[in-house]
């Protein structure tokens, strides 16, 4: 008997059975136990979701912006009231420590909805004078039906991040969570409905990449917001363009550089590096996995990193003292272990971790040791490719120009950071680093006000911040002539 039973689709304000006849199972990453059996959506189910979203969106867009704002604020209140309940569900689904899901996942999702609830009434056009008796005005209008495709590392947070600007602008959204962590998105749908969002405005369809492809190719969907891997993102963009030239926003992978200069506070630098690699067991898109350390301070920096890695508390996710849990799936565990073996084969020096954790009950879960390699080379697989697990690669440098060039030598451009006491150098380096999200003397915070997205193959467009509303509206220009019309013929 599974803990959460049979999971159905959420369409039109209620749970409905999928018509595909296909199901898949989802498991607790910490124990291997069956969590739920999930129904997979069919093409007919997607059609039903689109039609439901169209109907709901008309009612939602007909409300005033202030009405939509109040409803979204009520959803925020409900999320915060149910934080602990949702955090436990997220813990079981992702394997994250309960201390983390209580403090981060729902909290940051609610913050973003609150932020866009406040901006709903600020969506406005312009008035452009042409001459004494003629002017143009513009309107920002909703796109209609949009779709969000989530990743497995932050299920409910991503659902909030994608739906908040969409709904604030008057759109509907059909959301597909990852099949690896499918449980919490439907709870958000329940909360939206309870808060007063019309039925159909936020639908949840379950399934694997085939369902994502149906959404991407559907001509009735005006926009796709996708979070995931680069190769899948390229497929989504191709299908979106090929079907209806729909707009896409994508937050994709990263192999982000963290540069520690010789004047850095090494205790601070080590704290930042360990957080930037081992928070959420390393399953964060923006992780600073390429740690470039000035040659003169590398030994002292390594010693501090090792000291902090020893303090990491691996344990059961339900234990409030645990701050490092399992990876989200068996497939991800195998992938990470493969990268670790690659690092060993290619000659990187292993200074911490390097193996699966198999003692006692840990053998039932997807646990891997926090792993640190040093003396890495730029051509190593662990340095070039996104691992998405708890593996830090330390590389040395001696010259600022050289390290910037090496840091930028990647297909990715999601995040970057520097640690230095010299603020002039900090800004100079950051301005040269090719990344969409940058940190100076810190790492990882992504407040609602901060646009998030990447350069190069790390993404298209932005999430969060005021600019994101532009991705969920379209501009209509209207000319008004007050004077006599001058005929051409």
UniProtKB/Swiss-Prot annotation:
NAD(+) binds at residues 150-152, 176-179, 229-232, 253, 285, 386. Its EC number is 1.2.1.8. Keywords: Metal-binding, NAD, NADP, Oxidation, Oxidoreductase, Potassium. PROSITE patterns: ALDEHYDE_DEHYDR_CYS, ALDEHYDE_DEHYDR_GLU. Pfam families: Aldedh (PF00171). K(+) 1 binds at residues 26, 93, 180. One of its GO terms (molecular function) is betaine-aldehyde dehydrogenase (NAD+) activity. It is an enzyme of class 1 (oxidoreductase). The record marks 247 as: Seems to be a necessary countercharge to the potassium cations. K(+) 2 binds at residues 245, 456, 459. It catalyses: betaine aldehyde + NAD(+) + H2O = glycine betaine + NADH + 2 H(+). The modification Cysteine sulfenic acid (-SOH) is found at residue 285. GO terms for biological process: glycine betaine biosynthetic process from choline. Pathway: Amine and polyamine biosynthesis; betaine biosynthesis via choline pathway; betaine from betaine aldehyde: step 1/1. Its cofactor is K(+). Binds 2 potassium ions per subunit. SUPFAM superfamilies: ALDH-like. The active site is at residues 162, 251, 285, 463. NCBIfam families: BADH, PRK13252.1. Involved in the biosynthesis of the osmoprotectant glycine betaine. Catalyzes the irreversible oxidation of betaine aldehyde to the corresponding acid. Dimer of dimers. Belongs to the aldehyde dehydrogenase family. This is Betaine aldehyde dehydrogenase. It comes from Paraburkholderia phymatum (strain DSM 17167 / CIP 108236 / LMG 21445 / STM815) (Burkholderia phymatum).
């Amino acid at each position: 008997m599974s803990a959460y039973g049979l999971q159905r689709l959420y369409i039109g304000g209620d749970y409905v059975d999928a018509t595909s006849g296909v199901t898949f199972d989802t498991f607790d990453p910490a124990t291997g136990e069956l969590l739920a059996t999930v129904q997979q959506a069919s093409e007919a189910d997607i059609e039903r979701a689109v039609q439901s979203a169209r109907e709901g969106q008309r009612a939602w867009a007909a409300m005033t912006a202030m009405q939509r704002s109040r409803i979204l604020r009520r959803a925020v209140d409900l999320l915060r009231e149910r934080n602990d309940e949702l955090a436990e569900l997220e813990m079981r689904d992702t394997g994250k420590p309960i201390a983390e899901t209580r403090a981060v996942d729902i909290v940051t999702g609610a913050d973003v909805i609150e932020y866009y609830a406040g901006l709903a009434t600020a969506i406005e056009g312009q008035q452009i004078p042409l001459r004494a008796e003629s002017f143009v005005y513009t309107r920002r209008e909703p796109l209609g039906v949009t779709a969000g495709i989530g990743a497995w590392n932050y299920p409910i947070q991503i659902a909030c991040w994608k739906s908040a600007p969409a709904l604030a602008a008057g759109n509907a959204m059909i959301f597909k969570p990852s099949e690896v962590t499918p449980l919490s998105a439907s709870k958000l749908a329940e909360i939206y409905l309870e808060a007063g969002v019309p039925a159909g405005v936020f639908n949840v369809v379950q399934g694997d990449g085939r369902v994502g492809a149906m959404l991407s190719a559907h001509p009735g969907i005006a926009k796709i917001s996708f979070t995931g891997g680069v190769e899948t993102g390229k497929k989504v963009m191709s299908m979106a363009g090929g079907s209806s030239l729909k707009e896409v926003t994508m937050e994709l992978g990263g192999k982000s550089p963290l540069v520690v200069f010789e004047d850095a506070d090494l205790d601070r630098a080590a704290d930042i590096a360990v957080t930037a690699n081992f928070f959420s067991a390393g399953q964060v898109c923006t992780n600073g996995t390429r740690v470039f350390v000035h040659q003169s301070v590398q030994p002292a920096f390594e010693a501090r990193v090792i000291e902090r890695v020893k303090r990491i508390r691996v344990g059961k996710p339900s234990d409030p003292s645990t701050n490092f849990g399992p990876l989200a799936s068996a497939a991800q565990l195998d992938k990470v272990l493969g990268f670790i073996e690659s690092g060993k084969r290619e000659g990187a020096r292993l200074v911490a971790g390097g193996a699966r954790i198999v003692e006692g009950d840990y053998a039932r879960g997807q646990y891997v040791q926090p792993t640190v390699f040093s003396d890495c080379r730029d051509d190593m697989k662990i340095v070039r490719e996104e691992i998405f697990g708890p593996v830090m690669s330390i590389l040395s440098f001696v010259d600022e120009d050289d390290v910037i060039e090496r840091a930028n030598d990647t297909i990715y451009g999601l995040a970057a950071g520097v640690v230095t006491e010299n603020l002039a150098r900090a800004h100079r380096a950051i301005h040269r680093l090719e990344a969409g999200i940058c940190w100076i003397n810190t790492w990882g915070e992504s407040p609602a006000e901060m646009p998030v997205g990447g350069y190069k193959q790390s993404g298209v467009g932005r999430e969060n911040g005021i600019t994101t509303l532009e991705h969920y509206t379209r501009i209509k220009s209207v000319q008004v002539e007050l004077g006599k019309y001058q005929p051409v013929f």
